[in-house]
């Protein structure tokens, strides 16, 4: 695990709160991951506090699924996470806004499948902390 990830986990009290920047709790087999918020990893984005959010692996995968399917919704979620990064804490209002976007995505794409025929919205993607 990168040092910035550890530092952010402490600063944002991820373990104490029991949820990540998208309102997901740690599930069996999940790990803590660093998500690039402003400058993507593919564009050489730094692993720096100002450019990151801490996500568990399952919601991190889900966020990139949303990015590929509905870029506007991805941007809405990212905007809320940037706001929390700037504030320096996980704000319940931002988390509820993220949950609203995720719920809307799940309504719009319910039953959708990938090009390979796999379910787009896995069951574990819908298991979020009730805030």
What role is predicted for each listed range?
Residues 2-33, 56-58:
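Short cysteine-rich loop/turn motifs with clustered Cys
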Residues 52-76:
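Short Cys/His-centered divalent metal-binding micro-motifs
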